[in-house]
């Protein structure tokens, strides 16, 4: 008769899996993808390296699982912000502001997930995160287009272009430091949200009104 894991065993294995991913996330937040090493993650999780290998046979698989988990978390946050907005254009503005605010609040992790120079294998493992973000922005752009709030454009081209501009402006090597001053962080978020809306063809007065009305999320 084949062995069947009890519910307690299943829960314990799932909890350890989540603890490993949480430790990997902490490592990435502090030191980028270079810090996501099996031994270091094991130490943070309080387990042996061999235990991590039982869940994730290589660093590539660990990074891929981390990307999946963080992607789900960030997309859920963007979707929640968009759904709470009163209309398609407001939903787009809310998602843009939420992305900007969270990227600035977790700048090291955001850089690690999107732009940090890494080995080709690691870059391939984290590519789904950028793809998912671009797809979410594309959906919101299409909704605004369908409602007649944006001039005609190729949403599939505009979305990744917009994402690239936001990443570089928020967390790229050329981005100026926002510091910890809440007022300066809020101003940075609003400025880049305004930039993005203008780039999509929203007239200045309307774009400014949307930015003023959009709730900037508190630091996570």
Residues of each region from the PLM?
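Amphipathic alpha-helical packing segments from all-alpha helical-bundle domains
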Residues: 69-75, 121-147, 156-171, 187, ...
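Short linear capping/connector segments at secondary-structure termini
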Residues: 80, 112-120, 212-215
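Generic hydrophobic, amphipathic alpha-helix propensity
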Residues: 13-25, 41, 66-70, 74, ...
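Hydrophobic alpha-helical connector segments
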Residues: 65, 76-106, 159-162, 186-189
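Short amphipathic alpha-helical elements of helix-turn-helix/winged-helix folds
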Residues: 23-27, 102, 165
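Helix-turn-helix
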Residues: 19, 27-61, 65
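C-terminal peripheral helix-coil segments that are non-catalytic and often amphipathic
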Residues: 1-4, 135, 139-146, 171-220
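Short, hydrophobic secondary-structure boundary micro-motifs
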Residues: 37, 110-114, 153, 205-210
